[in-house]
Design a protein with these regions (language model features):
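Non-catalytic, surface beta->alpha helical segment in thiol-disulfide oxidoreductase systems
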Residues: 67-68, 105-154
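Short solvent-exposed coil/turn linkers within tandem alpha-helical repeat scaffolds
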Residues: 133, 181-189, 198-213, 227, ...
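Local sequence-structure signature of Cys/Sec-based thiol-disulfide redox active-site neighborhoods
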Residues: 26, 30-73
Length: 328
């Protein structure tokens, strides 16, 4: 029996030791985004995400040398922020291929437009603000930049807090306000909030659950699309289209998006594309988008017959469908 107690004590001590060993040191710049999120959650801090290309971008290297890597900046900003830098210098292509690919995926998911690029995130990874720094920025101008963003960041944090407490109606309203504040290209990062919304509004009493179901479909499809899993990306919208909560026009848009994704991927599965577009048309034949869908169906039929251009479903046509969907 004593041996069992000793063994149990050793196991407890081992677990405690391992747990301590896993604590992430956030007193300086991190280079792992997952570690940054864990540290931010554990320490209740914001995340300052900095995308750079030190070896190939003069602005990135100057900002690091004169501001971000200085002791004063790190000391001042690690009190409230977990600092994370994902760098895309050429030398990494030779030594860190796997991590570089993961970092590039994060760059794409956050719709980063250029190098360098700066975001303030919540511990969950939600975008609270975009920042901009001049090449000659110093600590004083950094204080101004962060200070100007503070009202926007604080408002986001207040809304995020409201999603966790209060009545269901108050929480749902806070989630919708966060979506309204977030750039459409970044709402896929809000997937956990969409899941929360749907769990709080199971009977769609708000009439807005379909928006969050659609957002979740886009989020999952984006992940699959980036992995080259086109069929799985299309399947997300096909699954969405079958949800009874959606209006006829929303169902139409879901089937259309599945078809468009497949067509734009270069797939030659024209019958499957046609099937998606036919289901889209049938879902709401009286909608404003229906006439455009009939044109798509004719174009795809020509491709099936070997008479059409494989790129016939154009970006202009896609924009037309999306505009009509928004107007509805």
């Amino acid at each position: 029996m004593k041996k069992l107690f000793k063994l149990a004590a050793l196991i407890v001590l081992s677990v405690a030791f391992l747990s301590c060993g896993k604590k992430i040191d956030s007193s300086g710049w991190l280079s792992n985004f997952d570690d940054a999120k864990k540290a931010a959650s554990a320490e209740n801090k914001r995340i300052f995400l900095f995308f750079s290309e030190t070896e190939g971008d003069k602005k990135s290297s100057k900002l690091k040398e004169n501001l971000f890597n200085t002791e004063d900046f790190i000391k001042n900003y690690t009190e409230k922020y977990v600092l994370v830098n994902l760098d895309f210098s050429n030398s990494r292509y030779e030594t860190e291929q796997e991590k570089l690919q993961k970092d590039m995926r994060i760059f794409e998911l956050y719709d980063a437009k250029e190098m360098p690029y700066f975001l303030v995130l919540s511990p969950e990874g939600y975008v609270m603000s975009r920042l901009a720094f001049a090449e000659d920025a110093d600590l004083d101008t950094a204080r101004i930049t962060f200070g100007e963003a503070e009202p926007e960041i604080s408002e986001f944090e207040e809304l995020l807090a409201k999603t966790k407490t209060g009545t269901n109606a108050e929480r749902l309203e806070a989630i919708n306000q966060i979506f309204d504040k977030t750039d459409p290209s970044l709402t896929s990062r809000l997937a956990p909030l969409s899941k929360l919304y749907i769990s709080l509004d199971k009977n769609n009493e708000s009439g807005k659950s379909s928006n969050h179901l659609t957002s979740l479909a886009y989020s999952a499809a984006t992940e699959f699309f980036m992995e080259g899993e086109i069929q799985k990306a299309c399947a997300e919208f096909e699954k969405l289209a079958k949800n009874k909560i959606l209006t006829d026009e929303e169902t139409q848009m879901a089937y259309y998006t599945a078809g468009y994704l497949l067509a734009s991927s270069g797939s030659t599965e024209f019958e499957k594309v046609k099937n998606y577009f036919q289901k889209a048309y049938d879902a709401a034949p009286e909608s404003e988008a229906a006439s455009q869908l009939k044109i798509f169906l004719a174009q795809v039929q020509m491709m099936i017959d070997g008479e059409g251009d494989e790129g016939a479903v154009s970006e202009e046509s896609e924009a037309s469908i999306e505009e009509q969907s928004v107007s509805n």
